[in-house]
Structure formats: structure tokens, C-alpha cells
Design a protein with these regions (language model features):
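A short glycine-rich, His/Asp/Glu-containing loop-to-beta-strand
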Residues: 1-33, 40
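Ligand-binding loop in jelly-roll beta-barrel domains
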Residues: 2, 14, 62, 71-92
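Solvent-exposed residues in well-ordered beta-strands and their adjoining turns
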Residues: 22-26, 55, 90-92
Length: 92
């Protein structure tokens, strides 16, 4: 499960939803939880490393890396190196 910290919950009529997301490390054989939702998503890794799987394609993102993608596609994240990963996610 991912932990979400909303950065704009009190802002009325917003066009984007920014979150700090924390993903704890899991056993390597545990499957990734996939999600999809309307719109687009921007992710910026703040701490750690993660594998981001989008529509069956796996990408490794390191601290400082970012990605912008169509969030209608099934996507899921996994922390790497046995350490948690924290990233900024902006959903539009």
C-alpha cells in the first residue's frame, strides 16, 4: 500500500492534486499493485529508488528522476534496494 500526503487538500477548485507518496519496501516476489485513473500524472523521486511499471513497461527511477505519463494506463510502483521511496506525484 502507498501512503499519500495531500499537499493541497484545502485548496478549492484546484486543477491538479499534488501528493507526497511513500512506498515501503516489500519482498521481491510480492506483486505490484496497479492503479489507473483519468488524467495525467507527474512523478519526481525525492528519496530512494523505485521501479515504475506503466502498461507492462518497467522503468527504474533514481532520486531526482521524473516522469510524466498518461495515468489512464495501468501503473504501479515498487521501492528498490530494501529502502522506502518518497516521491512527489501531481495528478492532473
Amino acid at each position: 500500500a502507498y501512503k499519500y500526503q495531500s499537499l493541497a487538500a484545502g485548496f478549492m477548485n484546484r486543477n491538479a492534486d499534488p501528493f507526497i507518496v511513500t512506498v515501503e519496501p516489500k519482498p521481491n516476489d510480492e506483486p505490484i499493485h496497479y492503479n489507473s485513473h483519468s488524467g495525467q500524472e507527474f512523478n519526481l523521486v525525492l528519496e530512494g529508488r523505485m521501479m515504475l511499471s506503466i502498461d507492462g513497461k518497467d522503468l527504474i527511477l533514481n532520486e531526482g528522476d521524473s516522469l510524466y505519463f498518461n495515468s489512464k494506463l495501468p501503473h504501479g510502483m515498487k521501492a528498490l534496494d530494501g529502502k522506502k521511496v518518497r516521491f512527489l506525484a501531481v495528478i492532473m
